[in-house]
Structures are given as structure tokens and as C-alpha cells.
Amino acid sequence: MTTVRTRIAPSPTGDPHVGTAYIALFNLCFARQHGGQFILRIEDTDQLRSTRESEQQIYDALRWLGIEWDEGPDVGGPHGPYRQSERGHIYKRYSDELVEKGHAFTCFCTPERLDAVRAEQMARKETPRYDGHCMHLPKDEVQRRLAAGESHVTRMKVPTEGVCVVPDMLRGDVEIPWDRMDMQVLMKADGLPTYFLANVVDDHLMGITHVLRGEEWLPSAPKLIKLYEYFGWEQPQLCYMPLLRNPDKSKLSKRKNPTSITFYERMGYLPQALLNYLGRMGWSMPDEREKFTLAEMIEHFDLSRVSLGGPIFDLEKLSWLNGQWIREQSVEEFAREVQKWALNPEYLMKIAPHVQGRVENFSQIAPLAGFFFSGGVPLDASLFEHKKLDPTQVRQVLQLVLWKLESLRQWEKERITGCIQAVAEHLQLKLRDVMPLMFPAITGHASSVSVLDAMEILGADLSRYRLRQALELLGGASKKETKEWEKIRDAIPG
């Protein structure tokens, strides 16, 4: 009997996302319920955004939640390497095989030509797609241009008519027309694979039997199925999990909800409570109980109990469930958890240099630095009264700063400062005009330790969360203002 093997393959390009933990949890439970194995693979082929720091954060966040894996970059295994950036020679071999078999071709089209083709197609109200320009180039011309070192990619061929039947473990057979599929790039000009080739090759070579992934990948499933067919490989069983959603039913995003696992750890949520809550996202225990452990979820796990309705990630419900876990702890357990959270040595070492020179005794630390140890901060609208800006301008500045910070990939003091500076300059303000708004939003006080240092220490999600709170207190942005301010945001450099 074949051993069940599932996997999670996150990209190390930012803070570890609760959506990653959600999919990892369901893959883990499915594997364990069937006596199988769970694999962690790192998709780091985006060399511009991938970092080893983000990779380590993924390991730390998943382990904090209690999710462990049998094979992976940090624990090894018989199917390594487990980082895609270290498997380039493998992908090249299989990409070349597809070209030799006539299932893929070398494309020399420049980005400028591709942009022009797309623009023409959109002007004709056609779906933008590759036009097949290089698909039938003579072999000798291809070889000559390759020998000359001309930039190129490898594209797969796809049918232009008919439908592809995608067998989904949750939905049954899903029919997707082939004319919706583009000739997907498999190998990029930098010699690294795209998601499609790498996932198919890795899943096959690593013996993955079941792929549980987010439903956002369902529309592109025909490309994966066709690649399995081209290689002559047995396709793993596919399961497209419903996406986590905001309370307004939109896709879960950092613009409306904190999405970083690190945020919930910093806020003082118990890992077992967060994992419990993620387990309730579209799934329920046979007896419908709301509170359960990972071991209990594994014992009773059944994919047939997954609901296709988009599960709502509601911060209030998570907080309620976390409270249930807290109240069931013994006093000793509670005290231990509080100590571990509040007196984290690594976190205290980040804060200490900014507090030490401002206090004369330890009792002054809490009033000065208490905001480092809370989720939200107490806000008073009077703190946002500004000598130079009217209330609408205050809201505009806070909204624009929030939007710019939401697009920030690396959360460092210099980059945070750059975002705020860019907003100020575009609005013809000075940095000193904007900073008095940042202090109360982030610290709850008109003055405190350096607010820029504080934002770096607090982290992206918690800082953005507090800015959202401040905006809500001041009335937020109307639909008309949002449209107007978005145009301003898009014109701000950086």
C-alpha cells in the first residue's frame, strides 16, 4: 500500500502568513490520519524577494504553532535538496525533455514585444495571452540564437480547444476550458523554474500522493495536469481548499486583517488556540465542539467535513476561543505563559536600549514602554489635533502612510522612514509635520521613545494594525475619499 505523503511549499518572501499555517495544518492532519508523512519544501525561486531570514521565520512560526514535518531543508530527508533554488539542474533536465518531446518550445520574445502584443489584444477586448510567435521556429535557428547567448524562456504548449477535467477531492470533476490557458513559461530567462514546472517535478520526485492547496490555484490546474500527462507520470490526488476570508467575505489580506503568524504571537495568543481556530476554518469535529487539540483533530480528521463556503477569519472569534484556552489553564500554567510572553529576553533586548536612558527607576518603565506589550493602544482623538493640518488632511496622511507601509517588503527603520518621508514630500509637508500623528497612533502618547524605532520593533502587522485603529477612531475614509487618495498614493514614488 502506498504511503500517503503531503507537503507545504511556502515562499520565504515576507512574514509567515496564517494562510500558510492553515494549509500546512490540513496537509499535516491528512497525512497523520492516514499514517503518512508531511514534507516542508521551500519555494525560493524568486531570488529578488526570497531571504534566509524569512525562511527561518517560517520554521519558527510553524513550530511555535506545533506543526512539525518529517522532511525539509532544516531536517533533511531522502528526497533533498528541499529548497527549489538548489534544484535548478533538475528542472533544466526536465524542461529540456519537454522541448525534445515537442511539448514545450524556446521563446525569444522580448518583454517589449510581449507588452505590445498584450496591449493590442486588450484593445480588441481579447484575453491577453502569448500569441505563439516562437512556437514553430526552425531547430537550426533556435540553436543559432541559443549559441549566440540570446535571452530566452521555455514555454509549454497547451491545447486551444476542448476542456480539461480537474478531479478535485472536494468538488468532484471540475471542467475548465483549454482556451483559458496561456502558454505558460516553465523556465525563466534567469534559468530558474516557474511555480508550475517546479511543483510538478518536485511533487513527482518526492513521492507526493496528495496535494492540498488553496482554491486560488484551481483555475490554473489544467497546466499542472497537462505537465503530468507530458511526462507520463501518475498525478497525485488534488484537493483545492477554500480560501480564508475577511468578515466582509473578501480574500484575507493584510489590508483588512493582520495576516502574520508573528503578529498573533506578539499579541499574546496561545499557539494551541490559534491552531485550534485555523482547524475550524471550513472544518468541524464530528460532535461540532469548538475547542479541540491538534491530536484530537488528527484523530477525527476527514476531508468530507470540509465546507466549500469561504471560512471567515474573525479576530473577535479567535480572541473568544483564545480566552477559553486561557481560562482552562491552571494558575501556574497561566503565569508561565505570561512570563514567556512578556519577559521574552530577545524582545526585551530590542526594547532596553530605547528605554534605559529615559528612566530613573524601574517603575517608570511601564508608563513609558507599556505600548510594546499590548495589541492596540488607548487612543484619544484630541491627540491627533494638528496645528497645520485639518481633520481631513490628518486622515489622508494616516491613510497614505498606511498604504505605503502595506507595500513595504522589508520592515526596517530606514525603509519605514522612507515611506513616511515620501508621503510627506508628495503632500508638500515636512517629516516633522507627519511625525506628531505617528506617535499617538503607534504608542498612544503624544511623545515617547523614537516612534520609528518602536515601529521596527513592533513589526509590520502590529504597526499597521494600530494605524488602522487610529484611522477608524478618526472616521476612516469615505468611498469618494478612498478613490481620490488612491490616485495620490499611486503617484507617490517608491
From Swiss-Prot:
Similarity section: Belongs to the class-I aminoacyl-tRNA synthetase family. Glutamate--tRNA ligase type 1 subfamily.
GO molecular function, one term: glutamate-tRNA ligase activity
Pfam families xrefs: Anticodon_2 (PF19269), tRNA-synt_1c (PF00749)
Keywords: Aminoacyl-tRNA synthetase, ATP-binding, Cytoplasm, Ligase, Metal-binding, Nucleotide-binding, Protein biosynthesis, Zinc
Cofactor: how and how many bound: Binds 1 zinc ion per subunit.
Organism: Pseudomonas aeruginosa (strain UCBPP-PA14)
Stretches assigned to coiled coil: none
Localization per Swiss-Prot or TrEMBL: Cytoplasm
This protein's name: Glutamate--tRNA ligase
CDD domains: GluRS_core
Motif ('HIGH' region): 10-20
Gene Ontology terms: cellular component: cytosol
Known catalytic reactions: tRNA(Glu) + L-glutamate + ATP = L-glutamyl-tRNA(Glu) + AMP + diphosphate
Alphabetized PROSITE patterns for the sequence: AA_TRNA_LIGASE_I (PS00178)
Gene field: gltX
GO annotation (BP), single: glutamyl-tRNA aminoacylation
